[in-house]
Amino acid sequence: AALLCGKNLLLAGEKATGKNVLAENLATVFGHPAWDISFHVNMDASSLIGTDTFRNGKVEFRPGPVYSCACSGGFGIFDEINMARNEALAVLHSALDFRRVIDVPGYERITLADDTRFIATMNYNYAGTRELNEALASRFVVIRMPALTLEDLQRLLREQFPDLSSKYNKQFGLLFMDIQKKCESGELTSKAMDLRGLLD
């Protein structure tokens, strides 16, 4: 409903809870092209909006993924948005609020195509992440992704490994949940295992 009303989404939760899969599926359901943008600590405004480049003997603007998405009416998927520094993200404020514009320094101000939406994902308590500032977070409708239950995990294991006996399915499920509890209590590092590692 939020996307239909022109809002942007922030999918937040533990790692491997399907945030990116949901974001990509939403773009598919709405029938819009998707731009996957992986955020990192060295990201700056030009890597999002675009930068000058030298081509055929002259300086030209090379659009970044946010600029291209905004012009095309696509869905921009901001993967792990809380990996980037808040200073780099400030350039997104006017695109994400009621103004729906992007200022391109030295060029023009563009208005986002009507269908343009942004879906950000973020992990909590993950190495290298930081808190989003309130100014940015307030521009999203936040959806907290539910943690994986034992029943969900066993269903996934059945789908991925149909030849696995129910006995081993349950044992793998219980082992994974035990490791997860130990990670949460600090007895094990969170690098010990995640859902992707289990299914691989």
Name each region found by the language model.
Residues 1-178, 184:
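AAA+ P-loop NTPase catalytic core and its hallmark functional loops
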Residues 188-200:
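C-terminal alpha-helical "lid" subdomain
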